[in-house]
From Swiss-Prot:
CDD domains: TMP_TenI. Gene3D superfamilies: Aldolase class I. This is Thiamine-phosphate synthase. The keyword Metal-binding applies. 4-amino-2-methyl-5-(diphosphooxymethyl)pyrimidine binds at residues 37-41, 69, 108, 137. Condenses 4-methyl-5-(beta-hydroxyethyl)thiazole monophosphate (THZ-P) and 2-methyl-4-amino-5-hydroxymethyl pyrimidine pyrophosphate (HMP-PP) to form thiamine monophosphate (TMP). It is an enzyme of class 2 (transferase). GO terms for biological process: thiamine biosynthetic process; thiamine diphosphate biosynthetic process. Its EC number is 2.5.1.3. InterPro entries: Aldolase_TIM (IPR013785), ThiamineP_synth_sf (IPR036206), ThiamineP_synth_TenI (IPR022998), TMP_synthase (IPR034291). Pathway: Cofactor biosynthesis; thiamine diphosphate biosynthesis; thiamine phosphate from 4-amino-2-methyl-5-diphosphomethylpyrimidine and 4-methyl-5-(2-phosphoethyl)-thiazole: step 1/1. It comes from Enterococcus faecalis (strain ATCC 700802 / V583). GO terms for molecular function: magnesium ion binding; thiamine-phosphate diphosphorylase activity. It catalyses: 2-[(2R,5Z)-2-carboxy-4-methylthiazol-5(2H)-ylidene]ethyl phosphate + 4-amino-2-methyl-5-(diphosphooxymethyl)pyrimidine + 2 H(+) = thiamine phosphate + CO2 + diphosphate; 2-(2-carboxy-4-methylthiazol-5-yl)ethyl phosphate + 4-amino-2-methyl-5-(diphosphooxymethyl)pyrimidine + 2 H(+) = thiamine phosphate + CO2 + diphosphate; 4-methyl-5-(2-phosphooxyethyl)-thiazole + 4-amino-2-methyl-5-(diphosphooxymethyl)pyrimidine + H(+) = thiamine phosphate + diphosphate.
Amino acid sequence: MREKLKVYLVTGRYDFSDTEFLKRIETACRSGVTLVQLREKEVSTRRFYELAVKVKVVTDAYQIPLIINDRVDICLAVDAAGVHIGDDELPVALVRKLVGSTKIVGVSAKTVARGVEAENEGADYLGVGAIFPTTTKDSPLTSLQTLSEIAAAVTIPVVAIGGIKEENIEQLMGTGVAGVSLVSEIMLAEQITEKVQGLMRVTERMLEARK
């Protein structure tokens, strides 16, 4: 599980056409991202499903896990690798019961208590943040100290989320994270291949420092 979380792409639609959206995801997959999370907050269930089907064709071609944000029904409908849920979604234990033992269940956590609870209820990994300022998440920032405390309190992998950029990844050294989750840094990159390769290099340096 830990290796799959190294450079974790969360999709952002922005103003892209479907063709451009899928092209950017495909380029990111080809360039080395290790996991893709499809995040759609403002579309109908049918539209989300149709996008998920198309994205899964891409991720399957590169043998990269596809995680669905929030929607257990969409995860099951397209047979995605798993689902990621936030604080205000279904209880983790119920999600685990619904998706079964073989699906990946990721959970957002901002406190040690939430992280420990999520692990006890069946989570496979935690997303912790926002660590740095971001327009994607409007919640208060999570400190590097809290990130470290959560990572130390659980046995499942932890991913840093929120405002992650190539130039600030090294600040995560020593926090115990397994990887980084990025949206605009990849989706809006002018040269996605070069960006992903750069992210992979700096992330691997950051991870090496913990050994």
